[in-house]
Amino acid sequence: MSKKISDLIVTNSLESTDKFLVETEAGTKLAPVASVRTDVYNGVDLTVVFADEIAEYGDPWSWIKARARARNYAGLHVRDYIPWTLDGFTIESEIAGFEPDFECTDQELGGHIDFISRDCYPQYVQWNTSNVNQGNATNAAPYMVSNLKAWYDSKVNSLPTELRNAIISKRSLMETRYTSGQTLQSSTSWAWNDLGKLWAPHESEVFDRSVWSGKYASGNGTKYPAFADGRARLKHFGKGGGRCNWWECDAMDASATHVCYVANYGNAVNNSASNTHIAPVLGFRIG
């Protein structure tokens, strides 16, 4: 005799040999309780899982770019990663989020995937060589004229050609902090800017809010799903290295000298723009 689901007896006791009825892409299946994941998802190497599909494109970056443009994310998950090499160092770039700016920004955006390296590039880079967090007459946005952004720009030509060709620049609403002849403690407005092919994330993209940054620093910042818990905020000084501090792209509010970063404990902090013991992560957008 058939029963309605509402007529079934509720149980709080399951054995490993009991089964769930599940809907999969291949149809309705039975799944044993023992197969249900209870561990934390750490992502998979996409070049292994999709090796056959990638082979049709010749390289993983052409493949993932085609996927993003088609808005085809089947089988892809936040924290899945693609390994590659920069300056002899192994980088594992993981999916931070799918389409965080779809149809947004001042230049309407189509399908895209944002990647952030699982660990830092193993080099300390000053946010600024002088201890200031100001914009200037060329661009009032502090990050846009920072030493950190200049460092990112200097690395673009060292990227693998296939990756460089797959990346699109990231548009972002950036805080502005500049008045000729004055040193400002807080940002006074914002403006759309092109962050380039490599970048550091906003504080709001990591913590979902401004902790040390000001009200103009998170105008279009959406928290990346990869940072849903503290594990992804912990970065290491290169793959296999020790825990390290890493930069964000925001100036600290109520300070003319400090900027925002993530501490080696995973928490939001600030320090001098000229600090020499903070490393960069590698963020980029494929689309």
Listing of model-derived features with the role each one plays in the protein:
Residues 22-40:
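Short, surface-exposed terminal/edge motifs of secreted or surface/virion proteins that either
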Residues 41-287:
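Collagenous Gly-X-Y triple-helix signature in extracellular proteins
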Residues 2-3, 18, 28, 148, ...:
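Generic cytosolic/nucleocytoplasmic N-terminal low-complexity/intrinsically disordered segments
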Residues 1-17:
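Short, intrinsically disordered N-terminal pre-domain segments
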Residues 16-19, 278-279:
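Short, surface-exposed beta-edge/turn micro-motifs
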Residues 3-4, 32, 202:
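Short, structural beta-strand-to-alpha-helix junction motif
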Residues 5-7, 21, 265-267:
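Sparse, context-dependent recognition of short Cys/His-centered cofactor- or disulfide-binding micro-motifs
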